Amino acid sequence: LAGKMIEDLAEEFHITWGRDWCMLDVDERRPGSLDAYTFGGRVSIVTDDKARTYAKLETIGLGLPKVKLPAFRVRTKARPMPLQESWPPKTVQAFLKWQNTLDSTCRKKVEQRLMEMFRVKVPRVLVLIDSPQVQYGVAVTLKRDPAGMDNKSSLREILYRLPIHRISVCRIDDRYLAERNLPGSKTLAGLKVGLVGCGTIGGYLAEMLAKAGAGTIGGKLTLVDMGSLEPGNLGRHRLGFDALIKKKAEAMCDELRRVAPGIDAAAVVGDVKAANM
């Protein structure tokens, strides 16, 4: 390769990484601690707002797990790329060695946090690396007496030899979901948006506004319509038979909360002149 395919290695990194998944639902604008949970299998979730994340997970029949998982995240400016030898890393030592080739500062932070948790006997930890374009991580079970280690081994030596489980991270936060479909464009996230009319065009438009970020990250989407969904509307409306004779604004808000959990959508059934937009 002679260093001529570095970009290709970075682009294909996710293919060579882990099969276990971590869903990340974090508002990057808000500093603070992160809560991590595991479903006990090959899926975990990290959030900074349990109520918002619970609404999303409930939609797909999961809900928020009860088993908490200690976690921390380290940011780096280095894009990950596979090594051309000894890949993928299988131990903490191999993972740290790889990180050192990318960003020595990041490696030091990861090792420091792992040692801190190892000393206080944290049983298992999730490590997330926030790098440009992609986030990834590893899970480590912090056993103090792994097979093959003698009593004279230091904590650091024991830590280095522990196996890792590679974790692929997928973002499910509102900002990412809006920006992913509008690369390079400004989204409606964080704005107050009003839509007058939830008929044939308005119903589909309301859904598109939601997918563009309206009603998320502190914003609000207000739908105004005084009419009800009638049988003659069913063949062409975004709403279906379950919304028959319901107020269109209210039914559309309910539908948006179903397809975009966590959205702040409000219905105004009446004259738009009386609405506080």
Predicted regions and their residues:
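Beta-sheet entry/capping signal
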Residues: 124-126, 192-193, 220-222, 264-266
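Glycine-rich phosphate-binding loop and adjoining beta1-alpha1-beta2 segment
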Residues: 220-263
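S-adenosyl-L-methionine
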Residues: 257-276
